[in-house]
Amino acid sequence: MAAAPPYVPLAWEEVPCPFCGSDDPSLYERFGSALQYTYVLCRRCRLVYSSPRPRYDAHFVEAAYASYYQLADTVALGPDTLVRESSVPMFREEVAHLVQFDARRSAVLDVGSGMGTFLFAAKPLYEEAVGLDVSPRMAAVVEAQLGVRVHLDRFEDFVHPRKFSLIHMSHVLEHVPDPNRWLRKAASLLDDGGILAVNVPNKFSAGARVQHLAYRLRLKRQFQRGWSDPARTPDHLFEPTLPSMRFLLARNGYEILDHHSYSRRDPASRRTPLARLVHRGLKVGSNLAFVARPRRAG
């Protein structure tokens, strides 16, 4: 297979902090095959974000998600298509944890439903399961094998006749240019007492901190692994951190019911005393999980 051509942005744009709107960041690190991209650190909310970044337009989106569309185009219907065995237990554990906060269990929406693994785990516990994705092929696979409706739409424009008691977003928020708008949209789609579950990478994890220190001491050329490929794009528009996520949720009227870091082997971070210390006490794992509910007026 021929290598993908190098990605060259049509234009660049400087942006304020996507979480708080502040425009007074400090340099955090440079990355990319030629260190052509820049992460800055917001002094106000502590979000790490890309600026200047390639202009967020159709050209960037097509390049950023080319590999996902390529995967979707090659998916074939079959008994083993839907889920990878390694990920089924993880999502089942996550769903079992989330339903503790969702007494109603009426309808669930998975934003960025992909291969449908989360919906596969959640469907038996909910009256209705709905997916939202950008790939028609992937949506067709999930609909055919799970019998759930997968909508092809932007989340900002998505409408549904029924409110949801759970909205799930796993590792999609960091790809979104306006995360505040997404959280407000989620609140409008949630039933009274409904919950939002958000999973994101943790830029301030212990591992990330150590590698960033090595970068600052010039012991490592750049933080990201795999950035030697010039075709790669900075598809993460920002890298969430614990303080910035707390800020974002509070700013948009959410009450945090539970939050912790996690590993794929233990999504609820409760299996061992060490896991509880690292992920629920210190919260320094490589991923962050939040369960939140819109605050009631009055």
Model-derived features with residue positions:
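Conserved class I S-adenosyl-L-methionine
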Residues: 198-220
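Conserved N-terminal segment of class I S-adenosyl-L-methionine
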Residues: 1-170, 179-183, 242, 259-278, ...
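Short active-site alpha-helical segment characteristic of glycosyltransferases
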Residues: 245
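A short glycine-rich, Lys/Arg-flanked "PGG" loop and its adjoining helix->strand segment in the class I
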Residues: 180-195
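Short catalytic micro-motifs in class I SAM-dependent methyltransferases
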Residues: 170-175, 199
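Acceptor-substrate binding/catalytic loop of class I
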Residues: 33-36, 228-242
